[in-house]
Amino acid sequence: MAKTHFQGNETATSGELPQVGDNLAEFNLVNTELGEVSSKDFQGRKLVLNIFPSVDTGVCATSVRKFNEAAASLENTTVLCISKDLPFALGRFCSAEGIENVTPVSAFRSTFGEDNGIVLEGSPLKGLLARSVIVVDENGKVAYTQLVDEISTEPDYDAALAALN
């Protein structure tokens, strides 16, 4: 189990993030129209997986906004914003904020969190996804990972985006 912190208190995750060079585990998530989104849908494209507990928190919302801004200039890259929020909440947030360059998807009925070792095991956020980023190359290999040390802080956007090159 990996360790992260929530408001200064250590909490464990359900496992470890995949290692750089590993194949990303196949996944199925749910988009804002309740349609299935599969890792197979992105074959041949680079992926940035912006993973967070809930879009209804300030830091999570900020991460979606910042990756949305960055995604506008990325080539052959899809940015997935992933939480266990219901698809309706993700859609409402993105509509209200004018978010159009990222793909919001929900892991609410998926093993995505377990498969990537990022389900929070403790803290008041138990069961939600830990704030993390996974960058995947066009061949499905993990190029970068970050488990953010303090859930209430933002990920390292620059490092994640640099891993695309």
Curated annotation (Swiss-Prot):
Keyword Oxidoreductase assigned: yes
Classification via InterPro entries: Redoxin (IPR013740), Thioredoxin-like_sf (IPR036249), Thioredoxin_domain (IPR013766), TPX (IPR002065), Tpx_CS (IPR018219), Tpx_Peroxidase_subfamily (IPR050455)
E.C. number: 1.11.1.24
Stored Pfam families: Redoxin
Cysteines paired by S-S bonds: 60-94
Domain Thioredoxin, first and last residues per copy: 18-165
Keywords: Antioxidant, Disulfide bond, Oxidoreductase, Peroxidase, Redox-active center
PROSITE patterns reported in the protein's UniProt record: THIOREDOXIN_2, TPX
Residues annotated as catalytic: 60 (cysteine sulfenic acid (-soh) intermediate)
Gene3D superfamilies, A to Z: Glutaredoxin
Catalysed conversion reaction: a hydroperoxide + [thioredoxin]-dithiol = an alcohol + [thioredoxin]-disulfide + H2O
Top-level EC class: oxidoreductase
Keyword Oxidoreductase assigned: yes
GO molecular function, one term: thioredoxin peroxidase activity
Annotated HAMAP family: Tpx (MF_00269)
UniProt similarity note: Belongs to the peroxiredoxin family. Tpx subfamily.
Function: Thiol-specific peroxidase that catalyzes the reduction of hydrogen peroxide and organic hydroperoxides to water and alcohols, respectively. Plays a role in cell protection against oxidative stress by detoxifying peroxides.
Complex and partners: Homodimer.
Further comment found in the protein's record: The active site is a conserved redox-active cysteine residue, the peroxidatic cysteine (C(P)), which makes the nucleophilic attack on the peroxide substrate. The peroxide oxidizes the C(P)-SH to cysteine sulfenic acid (C(P)-SOH), which then reacts with another cysteine residue, the resolving cysteine (C(R)), to form a disulfide bridge. The disulfide is subsequently reduced by an appropriate electron donor to complete the catalytic cycle. In this atypical 2-Cys peroxiredoxin, C(R) is present in the same subunit to form an intramolecular disulfide.
Protein name (Swiss-Prot/TrEMBL): Thiol peroxidase
Chain's gene name: tpx
